[in-house]
UniProtKB/Swiss-Prot annotation:
<dbReference type="InterPro" id="IPR002750">
    <property type="entry name" value="CobE/GbiG_C"/>
</dbReference>
<dbReference type="InterPro" id="IPR036518">
    <property type="entry name" value="CobE/GbiG_C_sf"/>
</dbReference>
<dbReference type="Pfam" id="PF01890">
    <property type="entry name" value="CbiG_C"/>
</dbReference>
<dbReference type="InterPro" id="IPR021744">
    <property type="entry name" value="CbiG_N"/>
</dbReference>
<dbReference type="Pfam" id="PF11760">
    <property type="entry name" value="CbiG_N"/>
</dbReference>
<dbReference type="InterPro" id="IPR052553">
    <property type="entry name" value="CbiG_hydrolase"/>
</dbReference>
<dbReference type="GO" id="GO:0043779">
    <property type="term" value="F:cobalt-precorrin-5A acetaldehyde-lyase activity"/>
</dbReference>
<dbReference type="InterPro" id="IPR038029">
    <property type="entry name" value="GbiG_N_sf"/>
</dbReference>
<keyword id="KW-0378">Hydrolase</keyword>
<comment type="pathway">
    <text>Cofactor biosynthesis; adenosylcobalamin biosynthesis; cob(II)yrinate a,c-diamide from sirohydrochlorin (anaerobic route): step 5/10.</text>
</comment>
<protein>
    <recommendedName>
        <fullName>Probable cobalt-precorrin-5A hydrolase</fullName>
        <ecNumber>3.7.1.12</ecNumber>
    </recommendedName>
</protein>
<comment type="similarity">
    <text>Belongs to the CbiG family.</text>
</comment>
<dbReference type="GO" id="GO:0009236">
    <property type="term" value="P:cobalamin biosynthetic process"/>
</dbReference>
<keyword id="KW-0169">Cobalamin biosynthesis</keyword>
Length: 323
């Protein structure tokens, strides 16, 4: 997902560079552009404009907005570092990125959505936060209105460790589904973590690499469905002990399965890894294959939400279903 950061003034450029540092740290693809060079390419996941709201509304918004369920987010940031999410705040991640950035540049968020102003979590934001299928339009309107007046029931799979959420009365059941207001059923999307590591890697290095990767995407361990790696690493103690500690299944893939992905998906290739393992990479293709195995979906319905993350001899990638 590409995020474009657009500025006009020298002060705006300085803030844009601060925002870029935050997005780089969290491993989100991003690009800083002066307004004179800025073009909408329609493959962006979000826009951060450091300028007056009126400029964005008049010059760009009509070209960006199209569908509430698919629009990229749009955030306005002024030169006091006040961030205002104005489009696709919940499903597109506008509120999430506003908070993420503000917390890291000593800024503040000005919310305009009723649920957020009142400290509540709307059902659309809930689905984004917990990686659930997207609610229907009618359900978003109904629940987000109701939650402003009273707590809404929320039933979760019993091993999920979410205890408190403002606006909801939480209970648990044995089913692998989330039920909102006793009637709205939302299917959890499968999440898989792909792992690669050098030979003889220590457990603590694998463990902390995984923890950091999950932190970067705000995913609790209990929300992960499976880990995955290549057959060459199936006896690697550092990987086995880490996966066992997290109490999750480990899916093993053959070299041929890993290599097949590179013929179908444009992934980063490492000649160094190919020289030693006979594949161009492990963590990214393993995570994608694991989601495919868990869902039986085609590759077009799967996406990487964290590209290959390297730390202390370990590589980690995270994939999930693409709605």
């Amino acid at each position: 997902m590409m995020i474009k950061i657009v500025y006009i003034t020298k002060r705006g450029k300085k803030i844009a560079e601060e925002i870029k540092d935050v997005l780089d740290y969290y491993h989100y693809d991003n690009k800083v552009e002066p307004i004179k060079d800025f073009k909408i390419e329609r493959n962006e996941g979000g826009f951060i404009f450091i300028m007056a709201t009126g400029i964005v509304l008049r010059k760009f918004l009509d070209e960006i907005k199209n569908d509430k369920f698919k629009d990229p987010f749009v955030i306005i940031c002024n030169e006091n570092k006040e961030l205002i999410p104005i489009l696709s705040n919940h499903l597109g991640g506008g509120n999430y990125f506003s908070k993420l950035i503000a917390n890291n540049i000593n800024g503040r968020v000005i919310f305009t959505t009723a649920t957020d102003v009142n400290g509540k979590v709307g059902i659309d934001e809930l689905s984004k936060m917990l990686f659930l299928e997207t609610p229907k339009r009618k359900h978003i309107l109904d629940i987000n209105k109701k939650i402003l007046e009273e707590d809404v029931s929320l039933t979760l799979p019993k091993y999920w460790k979410l205890r408190n959420l403002n606006g909801y009365k939480i209970s648990y059941h044995d089913k692998y589904e989330v039920v909102v207001d006793d009637s709205i059923r939302l299917k959890p999307l499968k999440i898989a973590v792909g792992l690669g590591a050098r030979k003889g890697i220590e457990r603590y290095k694998v463990y902390w690499a995984v923890k950091k990767a999950l932190f970067l995407r705000n995913i609790p361990v209990w929300r992960v469905d499976a880990f995955a790696t290549i057959e060459d690493k199936k006896h690697e103690r550092g990987i086995l002990e880490t996966v066992n500690k997290f109490k999750k299944p480990l899916i093993i893939f053959k070299r041929e399965e890993i290599n097949e992905i590179y013929e179908k998906i444009d992934l980063e290739k490492s000649e160094f890894v190919y020289k030693h393992l006979g594949v161009y990479g492990v963590s990214e293709p393993a995570s994608i294959l694991a989601v495919k195995k868990l869902t039986n979906k085609d590759f077009d319905s799967i996406k990487l939400i964290l590209k290959k993350f390297k730390r202390n001899g370990v590589t980690v990638a995270i994939a999930t279903e693409n709605l």
